[in-house]
Amino acid sequence: VMATKIPFIYEYEYSYGALEELTPLIRRVTAPNPSGFTFHGTGTYIIGRGNVAVVDPGPLIEEHVKALENLLQGETVTHILITHTHADHSPAAAPLKKVWGTKTYGYGPHGAGKIEPGAQIEAGGDMEFIPDVEVRDGDIIEGDGWTVECVYTPGHTSNHICFSLKEENALFTGDHVMGWSTSVIGPPDGDMTSYISSLEKLLLRDDEIYWPTHGTCITDVKNFVQAFIDHRLDRER
């Protein structure tokens, strides 16, 4: 059997602490936390103009938090959306909440999608984060000039959610689908069966572009997701 080749994308234009204009409704600030898990760092996305949502505020690095505060001066963060509770995604929600008095939205605390104990205490998990608003699959979040649908995608973590920006047919994929690497699926909280089901779920959607929290956007979304599924099934055989 030929192993499936995933068409990885390694280009990534960024500079730390700068506000990149990506599309009419999407901007991004990259945190200075490069690693083997985060690629060049956590890409914190800003949806909208004026009254905005922040997707995955990122790690608790003062430089990054200050950059977000400074770059968004004159704007108001009305929503903070968390794809999942890992230390490179959710902790910066706490200081940003203080600045703007914003509510956070997520599936639940770490291990929320799991029954057995153990998932709640794994390394790399953000155990502090509890969303102000718990969202479920299909929930709609209405902002000022933007609309987001919640897409529950357990696998990488049991509480992983993608956020679909309706106005641009775009999906913020967190760590569920990345362009430069496959996801780490580590038990007890990660689950391979859920992960493959969540990938198959994306194939049924009509999103045209993916914005992962690490690395650049993915435009050939269906083929990309199918390659991920095939790659995992090759390995499981």
What does each model-found stretch correspond to?
Residues 3-8, 237:
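C-terminal regulatory/interaction regions
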Residues 12, 16-74, 162-173:
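Conserved beta-strand hairpin/beta-sheet module of binuclear metal-dependent hydrolase folds
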Residues 22, 99-100, 206:
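Short, structured coil segments at secondary-structure junctions
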Residues 30-32, 81, 108, 214:
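Residues at the C-termini of beta-strands that transition into short coil/loop
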Residues 40, 59-145, 169, 219, ...:
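Active-site HxH/HxHxD metal-binding segment of metal-dependent hydrolases
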Residues 45-46, 70-73, 97-99, 189-190, ...:
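Glycine-rich, phosphate-binding/catalytic loops in enzymes
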Residues 52-54, 59-61, 121-130, 140, ...:
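Metallo-beta-lactamase
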